[in-house]
């Protein structure tokens, strides 16, 4: 009997697939297409089990769709620009390009042994000049379409990475990569007009039926549509040019509870006061040490500076409110100015309490009297409340009704207008770093800002740069920076900012349709392959990458690079769970944790016998060393074992805990399948009565595995394959029936364990490669059960069940029921008073 040896067989089948060009995507108008894509990785240098799970999911889908007759596009590339490469250059010497391409080579070498059905001929990295040159061409097209602009802006500045961060890249007030506290700084920045699409991006979420509801909700909240009132306070004693203070509020129904007005430190009025008042300047400088994101402002201590200025209430000019500069007001949301109603906003309540300002309730819960508030009363807008200082609508109404009535009333009185605003702000893409896509514009003293001529693209990054000091090396590279104006030929200066790396990943899915085209996309190829039918990646990308990609698809459609049908680029989205592992640690003399790799721990002890603390499973982390190297698993068990385990142990949307015992169990099962196939390949039994039962079991396996794979219930598909293996091993059917079933088994398990499937397919005489075989179809007639299981009740209590042919006569069923041991015990030798057979449903025995 031969022995299953993954190390010897897996590479052989991978070579066979490559030689046959099995996974080369083919534009075939005669066949339906299917585009499956996993979010491409950053080339850190090592793949991890999370990568294995993610890419195996996509591979299962791609292989099954190809077998089902689709022309499949399943590409791979590298999200290759970014700070880690520059950091590596600074820490270790060398060049970011060498570090990046070296890591790509290492990761490709680790991924290929997994046997993924990837069309490697379409591979690219975003740091390839051929890729970012097309990105530069699109940037110029977007400039011409009015989707790009440049302005001075207060930005989040990372003082360690020395670059600007988008609000989404500020986590808990710190840079998402460096972890350094961000500060506010004013710089001239390039922006994409994503806010122009806010309403469309929000509304279109309802069309994404095959996206997780959680992702759609996260995007809706980030876009943040609100309906409110925009109006102007008149100012008392204001500096010249500031006689009105424009305010936006989502709660105009609380105007009669106003006790102060507040402006952003970046508001024009605050800027004016800053130039003329040292105390204001000091306060504003303090405010700028907090990031610009809402999250950073929310967590900072709320502080204000009384300017001494006053505004007049729009309904009572004798009623004046103090004007504060407040550190929690955003300049680029609304108008950068608000009025505070402390009774109905907790932030305003804390501010008013701190500065001794009045707190006047506007509404109360129904059937309550006005009393001093210990905290703000902030009911849901859908809740009915009693307005005691209302000015529009009913005395008792919901907050939603109160807001609508207040807007209508204010508009009728000439106090402002109803406005729809969005939380989503324009996307600042300027980054002060080297390892990114150069922004293709030139600054000329005569012509101003001029786009680079397209025939000069790509604007390549220079190789001869130094990272011996922080900051952007492009600023210190005169032969690259200094150039001539493409418009007038005069001396000019190249833009030294590079693009946010999220730009690179916002359109790569479109480039895969024609990765060698001389334009960003090829119209014919994009029309055939777009949209991505199935996109797979982590939910951590719900806002940044996925929202930016949706915007970019619209921008590409507007500039002629994508067809209208691709305005939503991803038809279906699946967000997979993580791969987790226990954490092993000991402690040093100071009690600090010292982490250990799983392979260094056996039965809870290190090699020297030292016991370890075991922390329950958590996300795999290099710092905590609870990582499993996929290459070790492949060397020990084979790629198919790794693939089988990450697919089998948990629903794919949930986390899966990697355990050595689980991997061993997966390996044992695959060895069992091999032995079963080897045994069946040598069987010679005659056809017999059990052949039909095995054919029916095979049909059920086809139906249920297909349903599991197509429904992303891979664990259920694998559970059915376990069951089918047991059925086949116990079957007494003849040799041909068993061989037929085993060949079907090879086809069904091919998406999950493709190497073993090829071995089994070849062993059982399958024609060609199973990777090129058509997906099996279940005979509908074999899916119809010809038996039925009937529960037996005696005096209303269930006593057992009986399985009988569906067409068995009631009289024959009665005989079998009366012969049942449980029924005989209940009867105690007596005859039943009544025996009722409800065909196909139940049998009732009355004693």
UniProtKB/Swiss-Prot annotation:
Binding site for ATP: 622
GO BP term, example: leucyl-tRNA aminoacylation
One cellular-component annotation, GO: cytosol
Catalytic activity annotation: tRNA(Leu) + L-leucine + ATP = L-leucyl-tRNA(Leu) + AMP + diphosphate
EC number, UniProt record: 6.1.1.4
One Pfam family of this chain: tRNA-synt_1
Motif ('KMSKS' region): 619-623
Cell location: Cytoplasm
Coiled-coil residues: none
PROSITE patterns tied to this protein: AA_TRNA_LIGASE_I
Primary enzyme class: ligase
Gene3D superfamilies cross-referenced by the UniProt entry: 2.20.28.290, 3.10.20.590, HUPs, Isoleucyl-tRNA Synthetase, Domain 1, Valyl/Leucyl/Isoleucyl-tRNA synthetase, editing domain
CDD domains recorded: Anticodon_Ia_Leu_BEm, LeuRS_core
Major site of localization recorded for this protein: cytoplasm
Alphabetized UniProt keyword annotations: Aminoacyl-tRNA synthetase, ATP-binding, Cytoplasm, Ligase, Nucleotide-binding, Protein biosynthesis
Family assignment from sequence similarity: Belongs to the class-I aminoacyl-tRNA synthetase family.
Protein name (Swiss-Prot/TrEMBL): Leucine--tRNA ligase
Organism: Cereibacter sphaeroides (strain ATCC 17029 / ATH 2.4.9) (Rhodobacter sphaeroides)
Native organism taxonomy: Bacteria, Pseudomonadati, Pseudomonadota, Alphaproteobacteria, Rhodobacterales
